[in-house]
Amino acid sequence: HIVVRRQRQMCIRDRKNIEFKSLALIVVDEQQRFGVKQRFDLASKSQSEEMPHQLFMTATPIPRTLAMTIFSDLDLSIIDELPPGRNPVKTVVLSNDKRLEIVNRLQKVCKDGNQVYWLCTMIEDNDSFDVQSAETSLEWIRENAPELRSELVHSKLSNEEKEKNIIDFRNGLIDILVCTTVIEVGMDVPNASLMIIENAERLGLSQLHQLRGRVGRGPNMDSYCALLYQDPVSENAQQRLEALKKYSNGFDISEIDLELRGAGELLGLKQSGGIDFKISDISRDAQLLKLSQSLTERISNLESTKLEKLIDRWIGQDQVYIKAQ
């Protein structure tokens, strides 16, 4: 049997009574959206003593996951090409002061018969944050481009209104969909060719790359993503935005994310943060780690007499080792 369920249906606390008699394989899509404990809970839902096989799929591995592939705790397979007919999304980084200049681009895109996502990090204005909200942006777009059909999608709308606007956008009845990160996964509109992301400095690399992937899904279409930022921008945020501008491959972006945020706890729950190595650097020394793993495998396959000679040569009388039984 195959069971297909959403993350929330399987992982929340009141689902502890869900168990499988013989769980053999777990396939997790959009793995970056799951926490460490959630993935562990999934694997522990089998009544069998054998650990089920696990296949994780993601366009942008989180730092901890990428580090686990480096330490050989996870086997890695990479699809390093786009689906047939798709072109990379061209990305530009612009100050929020350039908003008016974008209107001309919006009008051209929609005149050519294509559609636009305009993404905001907040639904409503908040005096505590200097950010553009979805509701304010919708008003601004309607004021500056009244001929274009624009609507909202965010989590505070009723399910009926949200679904109607999404369906209308898919059917080409809406030119500009002003939205929040609710459209990060599950939206496939091949006619959408432009993504505007307000206050992009507030979002992480993985999420920005996922959002950018909502456009460029049509065959042989030139698509664009504009990352708008609000000054002042931290050095870390500048590096994130430049990485999105430079790289289109999710694994390249994940490596930058690993360098910027750290690998987290390989044996704990943190999925990012520094590893307290005193000398080694996990990103810089990844090739050395692979070499050491290769040598370790070769040594472990040696005959016991040769292995004992090597251990004695390297360790001598300073260490005591116990031969595995």
Model-derived regions: residue spans:
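Inter-lobe coupling/hinge segments of SF2-like helicase ATPases
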Residues: 6-9, 13-242, 306
